[in-house]
């Protein structure tokens, strides 16, 4: 169910684009994201910072698309979001010595510091690459191809990267029986 809620705006954007075109799809994406945030807030009481960021970026770039009647802005939206996420990971690591990937996942999984660093750099690179790839598709192909890439290519690459990360992590995660309980370790 969470996955459906996460992909709700992009699925509606895709469907609206196929029926009515980019401008109606953009308005639908803005409305769907507002509904998504409202649902999350009602259901869970808390909206994650990344979700607020996503709402802000879609309202800003989607609104600019509708006001200027130019699809350029909505095509930049994924890149801006990817680069903001990657930039946050980069700045956190370099300037504040804070690994945000570890902060998000550290309670669920115990990993050595170098593995956390590699994960952080991996996600930073992934987001940077996805931002560039989005722009390349946006400026080298027609809008229909870009929308298809946004849904199928972007999500597909994200899933592939998550699977690659899971395989990488599986080499470093200890089975619970392999180590003494944490309260018994020196």
Curated annotation (Swiss-Prot):
InterPro entries per the UniProt record, alphabetical: YciB
Entry superkingdom: Bacteria
Gene Ontology CC: plasma membrane
Transmembrane segments: 10-30, 47-67, 76-96, 121-141, 149-169
A UniProt-annotated Pfam family: IspA
Membrane topology: Multi-pass membrane protein
Key words of the record: Cell inner membrane, Cell membrane, Membrane, Transmembrane, Transmembrane helix
Entry function: Plays a role in cell envelope biogenesis, maintenance of cell envelope integrity and membrane homeostasis.
Record-given protein name: Inner membrane-spanning protein YciB
């Amino acid at each position: 169910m969470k996955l459906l809620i996460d992909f709700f705006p992009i699925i509606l954007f895709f469907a609206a684009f196929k029926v009515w075109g980019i401008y109606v799809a953009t308005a639908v994406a803005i409305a769907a994201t507002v509904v998504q945030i409202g649902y999350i807030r009602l259901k869970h009481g808390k909206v994650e910072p990344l979700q607020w960021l996503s709402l802000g970026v879609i309202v800003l770039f989607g609104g600019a698309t509708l006001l200027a009647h130019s699809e350029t802005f909505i095509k930049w939206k994924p890149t801006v979001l990817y680069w903001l996420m990657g930039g946050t990971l980069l700045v956190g690591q370099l300037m504040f010595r804070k690994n945000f990937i570890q902060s998000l996942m550290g309670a669920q999984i115990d990993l050595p510091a170098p593995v956390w660093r590699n994960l952080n750099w991996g996600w930073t690179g992934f987001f940077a690459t996805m931002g560039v790839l989005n722009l390349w598709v946006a400026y080298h192909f027609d809008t229909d191809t870009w929308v298809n890439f946004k849904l199928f290519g972007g999500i597909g690459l994200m899933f592939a990267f998550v699977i690659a990360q899971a395989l990488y992590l599986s080499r470093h995660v200890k089975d619970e029986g392999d180590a003494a309980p944490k309260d018994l370790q020196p």
